[in-house]
Each structure stands twice: as structure tokens, then as C-alpha cells.
Curated annotation (Swiss-Prot):
Protein name, per record: Clusterin
Keyword Mitochondrion in record: yes
Disulfide-bond pairs as recorded: C101-C312, C112-C304, C115-C301, C120-C294, C128-C284
Family assignment from sequence similarity: Belongs to the clusterin family.
Signal peptide region: 1-21
InterPro entries the UniProt entry points to: Clusterin, Clusterin-like, Clusterin_C, Clusterin_CS, Clusterin_N
GO molecular function, one term: low-density lipoprotein particle receptor binding
Reported modifications of this chain: Proteolytically cleaved on its way through the secretory system, probably within the Golgi lumen. Proteolytic cleavage is not necessary for its chaperone activity. All non-secreted forms are not proteolytically cleaved. Chaperone activity of uncleaved forms is dependent on a non-reducing environment. Polyubiquitinated, leading to proteasomal degradation. Under cellular stress, the intracellular level of cleaved form is reduced due to proteasomal degradation.
Subunit record text: Antiparallel disulfide-linked heterodimer of an alpha chain and a beta chain. Self-associates and forms higher oligomers. Interacts with a broad range of misfolded proteins, including APP, APOC2 and LYZ. Slightly acidic pH promotes interaction with misfolded proteins. Forms high-molecular weight oligomers upon interaction with misfolded proteins. Interacts with APOA1, LRP2, CLUAP1 and PON1. Interacts with the complement membrane attack complex. Interacts (via alpha chain) with XRCC6.
Protein species of origin: Rattus norvegicus
UniProt keyword terms in alphabetical order: Chaperone, Cytoplasm, Cytoplasmic vesicle, Developmental protein, Differentiation, Disulfide bond, Endoplasmic reticulum, Glycoprotein, Membrane, Microsome, Mitochondrion, Nucleus, Phosphoprotein, Secreted, Signal, Spermatogenesis, Ubl conjugation
A Gene Ontology biological process term: response to virus
Membrane topology of the entry: Peripheral membrane protein
A single cellular component GO annotation: mitochondrion
Length: 447
């Protein structure tokens, strides 16, 4: 009767899909799986070294692109400065002429000022918000002291151009200083033997090794260890300490980059000369500084626009020609200033890319030094404890395979594989080892 009840219980359990998997491999088979997994780990160790060198190549490529950008910036700077010189020359010539059409321009200016003030303060209250009262008084004083002739010859645009030129020079100097210091450190780092020699045979693997008459650290198992320290001294090696100068230099290079990337000197100027009147918060600073930002809103006031359209050629044709010459050179200077700013942004992007690569390099170096320390012994890198296939269960998906492994000095790591990764798949242990390495590295980063 008891036997019958037991059979019924087993059948019910089976029907409910609650039978857990059983160990399916012998000790010899587990050993073979361990050997296969360790081969994969050994290959990944060598890939880690190559990963460091790959990042080095990317940094060098970025550095070469930076140098090319600097050449382009130098050419663009010459063109921009030439256009600025032409603009200043035309401005000085125009200022030398007696002011004409004064009555017409002054009448329009008196109607332009209240509209300009109202438009600017409305913008400031909506976008900038703070300090409207003080800004309003400053603006009224600024407008009363300004001349419609300054307005007529686009003096505000010329002043904006000159200020942008000053800021752009400051930005370029800051980035140049940062990149020069970081590049010097990086060049010194990459001259080290680690980067200038090819690694040894990456396919070597000997899980059990040979009996040693001398201490095992004189016969390092990993080719990584042998390529990093081919003539090892007596005593355990600490690869983290060996790499410490590398870590220090990478940190110094990162600091050289990051300090400038977050420096106030790296605030790019607003060069959207053609987008006057838009809700640009950067105009707030200019308005608070000297009220000239309000002149960017002249396009919203009809009488202000009429000042720009005043034709004084009948009174003084030469002055009209000079004004046209000024406007032409001004447009060229604005276009070249915008192009120059785009190149500066590209250079900043290269700096950010290099900073990110330095962070990756530091992370990869940390991983390589950790692997080098872990692979000095004679034991297999990866040992498989159990391989179990589960049928359907309330907590475990149907037909998954669980592989419990010990990797290096870790606690047991459980790798769960879906049904499509069969135990008969030649890449079965590669997948197990890959997932185990990922988990091991994740836990190492958290410690």
C-alpha cells in the first residue's frame, strides 16, 4: 500500500512538472568541461591584453584626428581674422564720414526705443526671470546713450563678433593646453615595453602543468604572466603594483582632460547671429552684462527695422557704398565665425572621446592586472561542479540548464542557459565560461 501511494505521489509530481533536474555528467566529463572552459578563459585573458592595446590604437587615432582638426582650425582662424579686419576697416571708414540723414534716423530711433525696451523686457521676464527691475533701468540708460547711427551700421553685430572672437580664442587656448599636457603623459605611457612588444603565443594552455622543482611562480601558467614579466624574480608577483605607474599616469591624463572640459573657460560663445529674437537663455547673460543682447530683438520692432533701411545715398553716395561694403564683410565674418565654432565643437568632441577612452583604458588595465594575479597558480582557471537540466518549475523556466562553476578564487557561480544552448553544442562551455567571466567581473567591480 505504501509503495502504491508513493508511486501515485511521484506520478502527480511528474504531472505538475515539478521534477527537478539531476546531475548528468560523470567526474571525468566534468573535468573535460572544466578543461574546455579554461581554454576559453585563457583566450579571453589574452583578449584582455589585446583590448588594452586596441584602446591605445583608438587613442592614437583620436589624437591624429585632433591634429588634423587643429590644422583646419588654424586655416579657419586666418580666414576669420581676415574677415574681421575687413569689417573693422569698413567700420572705421564709415565712422569717419559725417553722420547723414540724422533727422530721419533720430525720429525713427525715438519710436524704436520704447518698442525695443518693451520687447526685451518681455523676453527677459519670460526667459531670464531674475532681476528685471535693475535690467530695465540699465536698458533705458543704454538706449538713451546709444546712437541710431551705431544701430544703422550694425554696430551691435560687430561688437558681438569681436566678443565671440575673444571667447573662441580663450576656448581654443584652454583645449590646447589640456590636450598638450594629456598627450605628453599618454605618449610616455605608450612608450612602455608593454605596448611596444607583441604578446607571446595566445593559444598555449596546459591545465595540469608539469611537476616543478622550483617555485611555481618561476613557471607561470598564463602566457599573460609570461608576456608581462618574462624574467620573473623569486617571490609572488603583484601585477596591480606593477601596473600602478600606468594607473597613475592614466589618472593624470584624465585629470588634465577633465579639468579643462569642465572649466568656465570652455564656455562656447553664442554665434547664432542669424537667429535674432529667439528664446535663447544665453542672451540673458549678455542683457545683464551690457544690454546689447536686447539689440538682437530689433527685428521684432518695425521702426527699428526702418532705421536699417534708411537710404542716405542721395546725400552721400560714398557713405552708402561703404555701408554696403561693411555689411558684406560682416556677413562673411559671421559665416566664418560660425564655421570656426563648429570646428571648436568637433575638437571638444575629440577631447570627450579621449577622456572616455582613458576611462576604458584604466578599467581594462585593472582587469588585466587582476587576471595576471589570478592566473599565476597551477590550477585550472574554471572548474565545473554540476550540470543540471530542469524540467518546468514554478521558479525555473522549462528545460533550462544550470551549470555551477568556480572561476579563479570565486565563490560558486551559477550560470543558467536557455533551452537553445544544448549541452551537445560545441560552444556550450564557451557560453558558460563567457557568462561566468561576466559575472565575476561584475562582482569584482562592486567590491
Amino acid at each position: 500500500m505504501k509503495i502504491l501511494l508513493l508511486c501515485v505521489a511521484l506520478l502527480l509530481t511528474w504531472d505538475n512538472g515539478m521534477v527537478l533536474g539531476e546531475q548528468e555528467f560523470s567526474d571525468n566529463e566534468l573535468q573535460e568541461l572544466s578543461t574546455q572552459g579554461s581554454r576559453y578563459v585563457n583566450k579571453e585573458i589574452q583578449n584582455a591584453v589585446q583590448g588594452v592595446k586596441h584602446i591605445k590604437t583608438l587613442i592614437e587615432k583620436t589624437n591624429a584626428e585632433r591634429k588634423s582638426l587643429l590644422n583646419s582650425l588654424e586655416e579657419a582662424k586666418k580666414k576669420k581674422e581676415g574677415a574681421l579686419d575687413d569689417t573693422r576697416d569698413s567700420e572705421m571708414k564709415l565712422k569717419a564720414f559725417p553722420e547723414v540723414c540724422n533727422e530721419t534716423m533720430m525720429a525713427l530711433w525715438e519710436e524704436c526705443k520704447p518698442c525695443l525696451k518693451h520687447t526685451c523686457m518681455k523676453f527677459y521676464a519670460r526667459v531670464c526671470r531674475s532681476g528685471s527691475g535693475l535690467v530695465g533701468r540699465q536698458l533705458e540708460e543704454f538706449l538713451n546713450q546709444s546712437s541710431p547711427f551705431y544701430f544703422w551700421m550694425n554696430g551691435d553685430r560687430i561688437d558681438s563678433l569681436l566678443e565671440s572672437d575673444r571667447q573662441q580664442s580663450q576656448v581654443l587656448d584652454a583645449m590646447q593646453d589640456s590636450f598638450t599636457r594629456a598627450s605628453g603623459i599618454i605618449d610616455t605611457l605608450f612608450q612602455d615595453r608593454f605596448f611596444t612588444h607583441e604578446p607571446q603565443d595566445i593559444h598555449h594552455f596546459s591545465p595540469m602543468g608539469f611537476p616543478h622543482k622550483r617555485p611555481h611562480f618561476l613557471y607561470p601558467k598564463s602566457r599573460l604572466v609570461r608576456s608581462l614579466m618574462p624574467l620573473s624574480h623569486y617571490g609572488p608577483l603583484s601585477f596591480h603594483n606593477m601596473f600602478q605607474p600606468f594607473f597613475d599616469m592614466i589618472h593624470q591624463a584624465q585629470q588634465a582632460m577633465d579639468v579643462q572640459l569642465h572649466s568656465p573657460a570652455l564656455q562656447f560663445p553664442d554665434v547664432d547671429f542669424l537667429k535674432e529674437g529667439e528664446d535663447d537663455p544665453t542672451v540673458c547673460k549678455e542683457i545683464r552684462h551690457n544690454s546689447t543682447g536686447c539689440l538682437k530683438m530689433k527685428g521684432q520692432c518695425e521702426k527699428c527695422q526702418e532705421i536699417l533701411s534708411v537710404d542716405c545715398s542721395t546725400n552721400n553716395p560714398a557713405q552708402a557704398n561703404l555701408r554696403q561694403e561693411l555689411n558684406d564683410s560682416l556677413q562673411v565674418a559671421e559665416r566664418l565665425t560660425q564655421q570656426y565654432n563648429e570646428l571648436l565643437h568637433s575638437l571638444q568632441s575629440k577631447m570627450l572621446n579621449t577622456s572616455s577612452l582613458l576611462e576604458q583604458l584604466n578599467d581594462q588595465f585593472t582587469w588585466v592586472s587582476q587576471l595576471a594575479n589570478l592566473t599565476q597558480g597551477d590550477d585550472q582557471y574554471l572548474r565545473v561542479s554540476t550540470v543540471t537540466t530542469h524540467s518546468s518549475d514554478s521558479e525555473v523556466p522549462s528545460r533550462v540548464t544550470e551549470v555551477v562553476v568556480k572561476l579563479f578564487d570565486s565563490d560558486p557561480i551559477t550560470v543558467v542557459l536557455p533551452e537553445e544552448v544544448s549541452k551537445d553544442n560545441p560552444k556550450f562551455m564557451d557560453t558558460v565560461a563567457e557568462k561566468a567571466l561576466q559575472e565575476y567581473r561584475r562582482k569584482s567591480r562592486m567590491e
